[in-house]
Amino acid sequence: MIRGFGMDTITLAGSLESKLGAIKAAGFDQVMLSARDIVGHPGGVQEAVAAVKASGLRPTGFQVLRDFEGLSGHLHDYKVDIAKAMLEMCAALNCKVLLACSSTSRHATQDLDLIARDLRKLAMLAVPLGIKVAFEGLSWGRTINEFTAAWDVVCRADAPNLGLGLDSFHVFAAKTPLDAIETLDPAMIFLVQLSDLMWHETPTFEERMTTARTFRVFPGEGVHSEPLADLVLRLDRLGYEGDYSFEVFNDDYQQLPLPMVAQRAQRSAIWLNEEVLHRTRPLPLGLQRKG
């Protein structure tokens, strides 16, 4: 079993059950769940929840709440209703982390204090359900487009169940210096998502968005293997003890058999675990020496 790393259902094609089966067969013990996989289940949300629980995979997190912060009036009220519905699904899945991405809406304010106020409100909505909110800065976000800015508003919001969601794609796309990781509180990093990309640079927001949604690759498969390994090592030295999830949107992978894609993820997890972090991987029970 590969501990500490998981896959995201958005990476794979097919039914929810087949995705969960492929992830489990590849040796992972956790899964990042996409709301579309849950609400799109032919048997409805209840059967989707049952499938996740039957898989034995621990939910890493539930995604994704978009464009929540910085709105006003009827737009804000609408987003609060959406957030409540997503939090209820998150709780039904026994998932402890909801991922929220920074707003790209031109209707959203750029006032950081108002953004922090809205994020605090979101966190308070999650408290009765025992859910943490991981706030991630999209590299094409209108105001928050680097993890340093996301961390700033998380600190301003000052809610114990509101923390940072860190995505390596956005770090590399925005070219945020990795030294900034040292300013973070490891206990307030609620989720780390890892992926690589084939381009050295994505200078425009449009390029970042297109690449992020269609052509990410697994860690070690792209041109950022060295800085990605550096990022993981910096987080480890910082004291981060949470989960790593492979968030890999890739149109090509959607056309490949599930086991083949899951095996690519497995290779990445082993590379990070053994060659980067130098951890030993426990043998399956049947192969452990007895006596």
Report the location of each language-model feature.
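Active-site acidic/histidine proton-transfer and metal-coordination neighborhood
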Residues: E17, E69, G73-L164, A173, ...
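Non-catalytic positions within long, well-ordered alpha-helices that form the structural scaffold/packing
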Residues: K24, A91, D185, D236-R237
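Acidic/histidine-rich catalytic cores of soluble enzymes
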Residues: Q30-V31, F62, K121-S225, V276-R279
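A short, acidic, amphipathic alpha-helical segment used as a generic capping/interface helix at domain edges
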Residues: V223-L238
